Amino acid sequence: MTAPNRNTLWARAIADELAAAGVHAVCVCPGSRSTPLTVAVDAHDDLTVYSHLDERSAAFFALGRGKRTGAPTAVLTTSGTATANLHPAVMEAAQARIPLVVLTADRPPELRGSGANQTVDQEQLYGSAVRYYEDLPEPEVTARKLRSLRTSVCRAVGHTTGPKPGPVHLNVPFRKPLEPVSVPGDVPPSFDDDHPLAAAGRGGDTPFVSVHDGTTEPAGETAAALAAAATTAARPLVVAGPADGGAGITPDAAAALADATGAPIFADPLSGLRFGPHVGDAPVVGGYDGFLAADVPHPEFVLRFGASPTSKPLRKWLAASDARQVVVDPAGGWREAEFTATDVVAADPAATARAIAARADGTRSAWTDAVLDLEARYWAAVDDFQPAATLEGEIAATVAAGAPDPATVFVSNSMPIRDFDRFAAPRGADLAVLGNRGASGIDGVVSSALGAGSATADPVVGLVGDLAYFHDSNGLLALERCGVDATIVLVNNDGGSIFHMLPIEQFDPPFTGQFKTPHGLDFAPTADTYALSFARTDTVGEFRAAYRAALGDAGTHVIEVSTDAEASHRERERLADRVTGLSV
């Protein structure tokens, strides 16, 4: 059907190529200048549209989908300050290597710098954070311009995946009329027949340009040398940090590597390796954040996958070693902020692990057996510990141990992810544990969790702190508007408890007023505002009962656990003192 005007034709071409290139969902925010694109994506049979009222929430929702699927989701806004609200999620996507397509509508070019209403400088708005940027030309009804447009969209989507996934930005200017009204002479009646390729693309689900990603394997001699180094080392180690979007080491490859080299796997909770059916057979270790306080010998050879580990004790322990540390990164990037790594292998992590495993003939070493024994004794010590006050780590442990199999678990930054790292024991359940550890902000956590939940039929569990919940409570609107249910565990310690772990705690003032920032907020009214169930608990026992009940019930449940941040911190220190007595 011939488009009624050039804007409609242009926007339909963009929507067609987004869908054909692999975008399955678009988060749309209301606005006038983006009308042509909103109408086009809403009418497209192969695009699911999620309507959002707040741009920041929409961007994090799209980010969460990308984290869960490894595929790009698009977010669409009008011009002006709406575009700036996407920036935090763009930064997270860039740092965490998560595919994301940003579409910003814009005013005509001559209005830039003119003082025209709702007109700001949107060119290169996100700077170096995006993998690809293009300021698209104004809509024009010529075959070549439309072929160029389709090519640009496909190239942009192609840049969201590959060895270094991440966000891309297409800035799309439109003149009025923005609605799909008929403009005589704008689109010639014969245009579709005269230029079928430009008007309709390649048809079906075939993108105008197919961008093919290749899997880079290490050179044979490199894999052989690494295999020899791993099998001859008395204390080999595999460290798996937070995984990239769709480009991390897989459980089967990690298990094969550990089996062939005899090395244990220190698995970050966000690595994709701490939880899953492979845990029963592979030497997966999760208690290192706690037991490295003991006298643990340093490794001699380390293979590192993923981003820098969440655990500070692990990072410092590795930095203090004289080990050869090999970072395997698909893009050849550097994500090792202690600067003690000795090698970088620019190759696909799973392919590298398999290549090394195929050339290694090691057996499980006495070192690995000792580490696994220490791991077992650490978790026994945690289980036996009787805190004098609510230990927030018990909440994290309960979330991990009690989450359904399968489930998606989204963990907030600050103390929740640190407690999850230290207290969530490896488990054979199929848990997709996610978090925003790229830029490590507390903004957008609720929206990210719900975005991840929108991409799966699995139950969704969120573990958030009070400040993160406050910061993104408007993200709860997605529960009804986007059809997502979740169980949200809200640890309310009335402020920023992480600052108790820093030296500034000793200086009050300004510690309480400027760092801990107690707020005294009552979060129960969010139940009425967002039509959810809210339960307040004061003990770990009460929380466990409420958590079990929520998981067995339909709808969204928020379970608040009231804690004393300082008391919990002291109990964490007391447990650490006990663990210090463990040894290999």
From Swiss-Prot:
- Into which family does the record put it? Belongs to the TPP enzyme family. MenD subfamily.
Q: Which UniProt keywords apply?
A: Magnesium, Manganese, Menaquinone biosynthesis, Metal-binding, Thiamine pyrophosphate, Transferase
Q: What is the cofactor note?
A: Binds 1 thiamine pyrophosphate per subunit.
Q: What is said about its interaction partners and assembly? A: Homodimer.
Q: Name one Pfam family in it.
A: TPP_enzyme_N
Q: Which organism is it from?
A: Halobacterium salinarum (strain ATCC 700922 / JCM 11081 / NRC-1) (Halobacterium halobium)
**Per its Swiss-Prot or TrEMBL entry, what cofactor is needed?**
Mg(2+); Mn(2+); thiamine diphosphate
Q: Which SUPFAM superfamilies match?
A: DHS-like NAD/FAD-binding domain (SSF52467), Thiamin diphosphate-binding fold (THDP-binding) (SSF52518)
Question: From the UniProt record, which GO molecular function terms apply?
Answer: 2-succinyl-5-enolpyruvyl-6-hydroxy-3-cyclohexene-1-carboxylic-acid synthase activity; magnesium ion binding; manganese ion binding; thiamine pyrophosphate binding
Give residue spans, biased composition: Basic and acidic residues.
566-577
Q: Where is this region: Disordered?
A: 563-584
Which gene is the coding source of this polypeptide chain? menD
Q: What does this protein do?
A: Catalyzes the thiamine diphosphate-dependent decarboxylation of 2-oxoglutarate and the subsequent addition of the resulting succinic semialdehyde-thiamine pyrophosphate anion to isochorismate to yield 2-succinyl-5-enolpyruvyl-6-hydroxy-3-cyclohexene-1-carboxylate (SEPHCHC).
The name this protein carries in UniProt is 2-succinyl-5-enolpyruvyl-6-hydroxy-3-cyclohexene-1-carboxylate synthase
